[in-house]
Every structure is written in C-alpha cells, then in structure tokens.
Amino acid sequence: MSIRRRSTAAVGLAVAAALSLSACGSGASDDSAKSGAGSDKKAAVATGGKDFADAAKKTAAYGTDAEAGQFPRTLTHAMGTTELKSAPKRVVVLDVGEFDNVVSLGVKPVGYAPSEGDAAIPSYLKKDAGNPKNVGTINNLNLEAIAGLKPDLILGSQLRAADKYDQLSKIAPTVFSIRPGFTWKENYLLNAAALDRTAKAKSELDAYEKKAAKLGEDIGPDKPTISMVRYLPDRIRLYAKASFIGTILEDAGLPRPKNQQINDLAAEISPEKIDEADADWIFTGVYGDPKATKRDTAQSNPLWKNLKAVKEGRAKDVPDETWYLGLGVTAANLVLDDLRADLVK
C-alpha cells in the first residue's frame, strides 16, 4: 500500500504559496525577513527556503510503495533514497517534530536532539518517550553520540541537517523530510513509512482532523478571530497560515486577523507596534527565556494594555512546547484541547 497521501488543506496551502516563503517556526534562527517595501504600515514577513512553497506537496510524494510488513523497503525522501533492510528498532530523532511523530506511533527513540538551550524531553511526551540519550541540539548535532547509540534509523529534516546527511547516512539509514513546520502531517506519514506504521499514522491524523472539525462546530457560526503572538530573542512574530499553529487553526475553521491571513510563516513587528496583534483572542508564546525577548517591553506598551482582548481577559499565554515547538499530532491534539477550554462555553 502506498503511503503517498496528503491533506486537502495542505495542497491548497502549497499551491497558494507561489512565492518564496518562510522557514519553519520551531526555532529562532531559521528565517530571514522581508520588509513591506519601506512602508511603515506593512509588517515585515518571515521568509526563506527555496523549497518552502512546495514543501508539503513534495513531501507528500515521498515514502514507499512497500506493503505493510514488507522489508527490505526503499524510502524516497528529501535527500534521495534509503533502503531499510528490516523494521527499525533503534531510532534517533533530530528534532521535536520527529520526536512527537515516533512517540505517537508507539516508538521510544534511543536518541534525541533538543532545541537550542533546552536539553529536557518535552514534558508532554515524557510519559511515553522512554529514556532517549541527548545527541547534541537541532543545530549542533553530536555525531559521535549518535554513532555510539548504534541506531538502525535516523529521522530528521533537510532544513536542519542537510550538511550532515552524508555523515549520518554512514552511521545508519537516514530519512529526511524537507523541513519541519506546516508540513507536519506529510512529515508524519513519511516517518511512519520508515517505521512500517502507516496505518497507525493515518488513523491518528483522521482522529485529529475529526477533533478539529468538532471544535469548530462546537464553537458555532460566530467564530472569534485568533491572533498568534510569539516572542523570540530578536523579534516578535504574528504567526500566519504557513505554520504549525496556522494549520491547526485552519483545520478548526477559526478565522485570523487580516495581517495573519498570509501564506507565509509570520509577520514580524516591533514592540512599538504590538497593537497589530489585535484580535478577539490573542494567544502568546515565548521561545526560550522570556527575559531574552522584548515581551515585557511590548506588554508594558499602552497600545497593548488598551487592546479589547487584553482588557477583557482574552489575551492568554500558551505553552511554547506544544503550540509552536511540538510540530506533531500529539502536540496538535493538545492545542485543540487548549482552544476548546477557552473558546467553548
């Protein structure tokens, strides 16, 4: 059975994003920004990555034509083809998205590369993750540590580790998606194909999509606009459609402010323009140490304090590790739970 499946929503997003778009939202240093042609009225937009526009479409074409349980099997992926002689048992994951993916499929990885500055296993995965060893960070892999674990499969992305692929593939069969982020569903199916757990992945995605649709139904026809604000050490972002959280909100049918209805990762604003985050509900995340960001500066601005959502208690902090860093179906389901708690009365 072929695993070459993708969601209709992702197809539309990839087609609509005809220009070079932004990189994924899981880190602070993956993206550049283009300004609004010198206009003070138009926010900068996070951009980058030559394959961003087509990433979901391309990733959906990757995978295997092997039947369930069939090994050896050959996987096509972002870096070419990889043969797996037998079902993997010792898996190393190079980002949180792959971590979420394998754990949701019942696999306890032997190694994990966390985000910069945070070596901990994400709390929402800890119960089912086993005891994976640290193998560096997403941007600074420890190849010796990876080799020492004697993996039989390495899962990662071209965006994070293309320059390490040749070395990694000499350690173990290595399968790369193009990038993390709004392609999380396609990445999940690719990882599942390598693990011979495609049926499980499809079942998990179907359940997620039904859960998202039910949330939208239960909120009712008069849906509030949702603004997504994230504070990073060197920027403030309003996350848009081509992001992990953007796909979740779209799946639930939740509308966005006009400045976030773009086929990019995010708009970028200064603390002085924090009122551009205005919406019926504002959800804020922080990447890393809040003191290293301009969150306090932005939220002490009278423009922030005077927003209706802020005055009426509809501006809320959300966990960065699920809403922005999770990049997998387990995190996506937890985001839906959080949204339900706030939006369904």
Model-derived features: positions:
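Bacterial Sec-exported substrate-binding components of ABC uptake systems
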Residues: 2-94, 200-226, 289-295, 318, ...
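Short helix-initiation/N-cap motifs at beta->coil->alpha
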Residues: 79, 135-143, 263-270
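A short, structured surface patch at a secondary-structure boundary
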Residues: 90, 96-145
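Basic- and aromatic-lined ligand-binding clefts that recognize polyanionic substrates
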Residues: 90-102, 201-255, 259
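Extracytoplasmic ligand-binding site segments that recognize negatively charged/polar headgroups
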Residues: 117-122, 161-163, 178-190, 225-247, ...
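Proline-aspartate-enriched helix->loop->beta-strand connector
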Residues: 150-155, 173, 279-282
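Extracytoplasmic substrate-binding proteins
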Residues: 163-233, 329-345
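Structured C-terminal subdomain patch of bacterial secreted/periplasmic proteins
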Residues: 280-345
